[in-house]
Amino acid sequence: MEIIFYHPTFNAAWWVNALEKALPHARVREWKVGDNNPADYALVWQPPVEMLAGRRLKAVFALGAGVDAILSKLNAHPEMLDASIPLFRLEDTGMGLQMQEYAVSQVLHWFRRFDDYQALKNQALWKPLPEYTREEFSVGIMGAGVLGAKVAESLQAWGFPLRCWSRSRKSWPGVESYVGREELHAFLNQTRVLINLLPNTAQTVGIINSELLDQLPDGAYVLNLARGVHVQEADLLAALDSGKLKGAMLDVFSQEPLPQESPLWRHPRVAMTPHIAAVTRPAEAIDYISRTIAQLEKGESVTGQVDRARGY
């Protein structure tokens, strides 16, 4: 079995060595320009077109939960990967736990009004504030995939009313499920904290705009953990300035790194992190990929395959 690996920043030698330990019968190599030798599987992130074009691969693994970058390249270069070759994404590999940590900590931060207390501290004001109640602090999750399910699960223990919005109905315990555009308003109008975990598709680009934000309760919060292109940044800032939104926590941006001139840097009710909510953890990724390859070699059914038409 031949496996090729490409990532523009990862330590290729570490990955090659770890994969060979996990799959003793495999020969693994870092792909370099000019390497046209046969391969059975490819592990990639932002691969050059020539790496995959014309290869008779059994499968390709994208080294992340999001596959929008490789799908965008496939749209521009359909010859890059034959439609018959399955493309897999990393389903969890530790990302679920990271998303849980991030989402729970931020929801609690807002619920306990730590943002307000920080503002008071900056003014040297000692002023206890009225508490929020859990009943008025409904959390809505846009996107009900693997990561959305993990986040909902982690929030259940805290007693917040939970709801999710997705393209198909979910039957998660203790979570109200809303489906499609026709139920979006009903989902939004009782959502105090909006968590975005949608996939990046043509249908979701720019979805968090003024029309959507206007349907949230006054004083709502937005937590974006998915993709920067989901948010119309000017509309978000306008909602913050008007008081429609009380705060926003952003991990992803339309342009990364975020330009220094962006007003998001200076807005007092915007907090941000540099796209670190859930990063690929190599050891767990190796475990998932090696198990999946072993299952494929045995002809067993596997999960994590990308539906190219849907975009996730």
Curated annotation (Swiss-Prot):
Taxonomic superkingdom: Bacteria
Gene Ontology molecular functions: glyoxylate reductase (NADPH) activity; hydroxypyruvate reductase (NADH) activity; hydroxypyruvate reductase (NADPH) activity; NAD binding
CDD domains referenced in this protein's UniProt entry, alphabetically: GDH_like_2
EC number: 1.1.1.79, 1.1.1.81
Swiss-Prot/TrEMBL keywords: Cytoplasm, NAD, NADP, Oxidoreductase
Catalytic activity of the protein: glycolate + NADP(+) = glyoxylate + NADPH + H(+); (R)-glycerate + NAD(+) = 3-hydroxypyruvate + NADH + H(+); (R)-glycerate + NADP(+) = 3-hydroxypyruvate + NADPH + H(+)
The keyword NADP is assigned to this record: yes
Oxidoreductase as UniProt keyword: yes
Top-tier EC class: oxidoreductase
Subcellular location per the Swiss-Prot or TrEMBL entry: Cytoplasm
GO cellular component: cytoplasm
Active site: R227, H275 (proton donor)
Family per similarity comment: Belongs to the D-isomer specific 2-hydroxyacid dehydrogenase family. GhrA subfamily.
Task of the protein: Catalyzes the NADPH-dependent reduction of glyoxylate and hydroxypyruvate into glycolate and glycerate, respectively.
Protein name: Glyoxylate/hydroxypyruvate reductase A
UniProt gene name: ghrA
